[in-house]
Amino acid sequence: MIALAEGELSTPHVYREFDRLQVARPSGALEIPTELLQALRAGDCVQLGSALSNDLEGVAVSVMPVLSKTLQAGLDLGAIGAMISGSGPTCVFLTRSHDHSVNLAASLSGAGVCRSVRIASGPAVTSISNG
């Protein structure tokens, strides 16, 4: 489920702040969290929800604090995972089913923490390879 938080956010500004604050790491180093890989291999959507992350999220929230309200509202309303998409202000929520997404979208809309919501779907858990 996707929600656009209230307000606007400049992508170049978020990236500049990220670059300014980023602790040096080896060039080109990409670290995929072990918890994320384990959740994907196991097909465990609850573990996957806990493992969702975005390196830009902290910066985006510091530039636009209302994002944290949108993310927290989604979790409080039953999402099993939440994160900022890209540099924001788009928030994405992991749900258990299409019906769960529909209910969450209606609840978030009613909570007044976003300007619009959309339902998105992906592959079924059974299509995730355990190998």
Regions found by a protein language model. Name each.
Residues 1-48:
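Anionic-ligand binding region
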Residues 38-131:
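Glycine-rich, charge-dense phosphate/pyrophosphate-binding loop(s)
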